From Swiss-Prot:
Homodimer. The modification N6-(pyridoxal phosphate)lysine is found at K264. GO terms for biological process: protoporphyrinogen IX biosynthetic process. GO terms for cellular component: cytoplasm. Its cofactor is pyridoxal 5'-phosphate. Belongs to the class-III pyridoxal-phosphate-dependent aminotransferase family. HemL subfamily. It is found in: Cytoplasm. Keywords: Cytoplasm, Isomerase, Porphyrin biosynthesis, Pyridoxal phosphate. The lineage of its organism: Bacteria, Pseudomonadati, Campylobacterota, Epsilonproteobacteria, Campylobacterales. It catalyses: (S)-4-amino-5-oxopentanoate = 5-aminolevulinate. It is an enzyme of class 5 (isomerase). Its EC number is 5.4.3.8. This is Glutamate-1-semialdehyde 2,1-aminomutase.
Amino acid sequence: MKNNKKAFEEACEYIAGGVDSPVRAFASVGSNPLFIKKGKGAYISDIEDNTYIDYVQSWGPLLFGHCDEDVEKACKKALEHGSSFGAPTLAETKLAKFILQDWPHLDKIRFVSSGTEATMSAIRLARGFSKKDKIIKFEGCYHGHSDSLLVSAGSGAATFNTPSSLGVLEDVAKNTLVAIYNDIDSVKNLVEKHSDIACIIIEPIAGNMGLVPAKKEFLQELQALCKKHQILLIFDEVMSGFRASYLGSYGIYNIQADIVTFGKVIGGGMPAAAFAARAEIMDLLSPLGGVYQAGTLSGNPLAMASGYASLKKARNYEGLYEKLEKLGKRLTQGLKEAANDCKIPLQVNCVGSMFGFFFCENPVNNYQDALKSDTKLFAKFHAQMLSKGIYLAPSQFETGFICESMDKKIIEKTIQAAQESFKTL
């Protein structure tokens, strides 16, 4: 049996960088990645048969943990009839109706296979609807790896109007304006200078600079500004949708965006995402309108079955989100108390089943605040926690997730591990 180090060395021979998504390489924490062979509930096991409490949960999709029986059953039943047809199925309509019933400002939806596709398509749709070119995004918010949105992204350099990746053309980046998260004046300044803004896209609960929720007043002012200047407001709820609450940020702030993107939880662990809006906007999509979007595996029956099973269970589970939030708040409270006992500065954020923490003195409200976190200290903490069986995201600038399979005992075990880890820093 290979160990993790040898498995990574072999992967690097055949897979670019040894991984299919950069953060998985553990580069930011200075170690080798774990190769996971199985998971059940709140736990995962690597190829060396080490078991960990998993706070990554596949980066958010697994609301009920690994191998949930209801989701597995739905997938197996769907697979009996075929994995993909490239044709309409009743499963797509079933999931679409189920999602839209609770979002009064969204009339129609279209499924895709990834969050990147969802946000990319939403931007194209907004430009097609408004007949304007420029967009505004926020420093530190990540909306996938399409060219227009890889500007001052969560993982890139915080530089105004500068691509965060080689291969992104300056001619593309120049149409992406960057504002400061939770700072309405920075948005107003851009709107005053540019008359051709098609849309403003934001993570209302940002999860890619660590967890940083928007302030309600800021979102209210943002919505008012968009209405005043006829700019479409896009809420990227790929991470927060059905996670922060059943209705994502809408269930918390009660603010309606013009276009909303979904992902992660709506696939229940299978590749699925979506974007939705009122009919006037959505009917511009081909084949009805002139905005083109397509995908071979979009709406595939396995993902639709998995997503429906997960969302139906979440919607019908009385007290689910209260339980998850209670566990999340206890965890972050325990982490902060443990850090304080060791005189280590730690800021914590928790929204529903999403949480984050930063090794810095002051509260984190935007990307520049997040960058003040001591990433070297985080790397040491991450290694200590991993050695104690706690699997955290291998980056300071990622969000952690609570799943339904977790309980108070698991949370207290994690806090105990943190107490021991802080003492070594």
